[in-house]
Amino acid sequence: MKKYLKKSKLIRQAHKHVVHNKAKLLRTLDSFKKPNNASAWEEYINFALNNQLDKTNFVPFSNQKYSGKSSKKIIAYYLPQYYQIKQNDEWFGRGFTEWSNVTKAVPQFSGHWQPHLPIDVGFYNLETTKIMHRQVELAKTYGISGFCFYYYWFSGGEKIMEKPINNWLKDKDLDFPFMLFWANEDWTNTWGESADLGTKTYSAKMKKTDVEKFVKDILPFLSDKRYITIDGRPHIIIYQPIKDPYLPTFIKEIKNKIQQAGINKPFISLVFPDTFDEDFDPRNYGADGAVEFGAHLKTMPQEIKAQTTNEKIINPLAKLTEYDMEGYINSDQINPKTSYPLFKGAMTYFDNTARKIYTGAQLFEISPELYQKWLYKSLENSSTDQVFVTAWNEWAEGMHLEPDHKYGYAYLQATRNALENFENKK
């Protein structure tokens, strides 16, 4: 097992990062608004330059491997955007990956946790499965039962970022369950700060001619013995249930095609919509259930939302909204009642400053302790045996179970704590 980094070594590495990036950071800060209060500006500068050195809340690696046998399985969403693809090269410059956004982020106010920087796994490249073996080792150690890979498949059969999941399929030494999360939304270059780098759009609006192509592409995954199932039925998640009028027909047809291929009819879950529409029922789309993906933002009680003040944010161009997640997690909003199977979820943290600070970033400050509470409640209230965590490695949005400079392995440890506490209560 790869030896984890000790605090002293982490501090030295963090110090190197601070020194290396000091000039770059100061150039960035020159464009920020300096408060009238000189001491506030000095406080911010000191924080921005030294926040990676603070190991107050750092949790080290645990050699004790999870050995429980819970009735609930925790599955973490997995982002594959950690290698070069031609679309990102064309739109954002050669060599662009998720790490390009992660490393450019800076704090927007004193106390703002940015950037999020990985330890243990480092700034990995998913061109090969080398780092995946370490990811599996970490996941198993802390009680995670599987990865749910985002799968980018578009009308006409075009695919993006498919190499990691294809490599996973080929590497049979990766003895760990997995499944597909079909990210069926149009894909353009506009998710970043710029919208003028290209015009190519990959459409997720399905047509009848897409059915056979889609089924042909996913059959190798569904037939793999590691694929996650529900009562023997391969589980597939679909992201956007309400934006494609053809989707109900598409779901019905792919179910039939998959069954005709000799595989059990898939269990299809739709992402529970942010609108939290009480009339929403996945069965109306031909699906079997729904899955939670983060927080139900649009119906979050107004008192839980908190717009950051101009006095707090140093960057005059920043657009950032904070949410009181403790209030949300303690509210009834976290446990909606449905007549259909709803796969509960929890979120580690969320801060998409690295991607959206000038177009409307959101900040959900969720400490490891608060995340543990949320996950425990999801385990306790779930009527299904699968609970989903957002996310394993969405670093540019601050959602990562993977260890980081600030908290170390705290979110992984919180995952195991929640699972063990749930087991011990039964």
Indicate where each model-derived feature is located.
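Membrane-proximal basic amphipathic "stem/tether" segments
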Residues: 1-54
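Glycan-processing catalytic domains of CAZymes
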Residues: 33-426
